[in-house]
UniProtKB/Swiss-Prot annotation:
Residues 1-21 form the signal peptide. The lineage of its organism: Eukaryota, Metazoa, Spiralia, Lophotrochozoa, Mollusca. It is found in: Secreted. It comes from the Eukaryota. This is Putative alpha-conotoxin Qc alphaL-2. GO terms for molecular function: acetylcholine receptor inhibitor activity; ion channel regulator activity; toxin activity. Residues 22-48 form a propeptide. The cysteine framework is C-C-C.
Amino acid sequence: MGMRMMFTMFLLVVLATTVVSFNLDHAFDGRNAAANNKATDLMARTVRGFCSDPSCRFGNPELCDWRR
């Protein structure tokens, strides 16, 4: 293998590992951080409303116990 071919292979390996590591840094579901935060806020509001109802809170302590 010539020096030029070795250098080309080196660049291809570096490029491939950079692309793979860059893709792994993003959310796995393909949504951006703002969408993930919005979904998290919606879930928190739903649980908050659910746990504020005494019959739901006492019927599902595994969901609402963290609030005590």
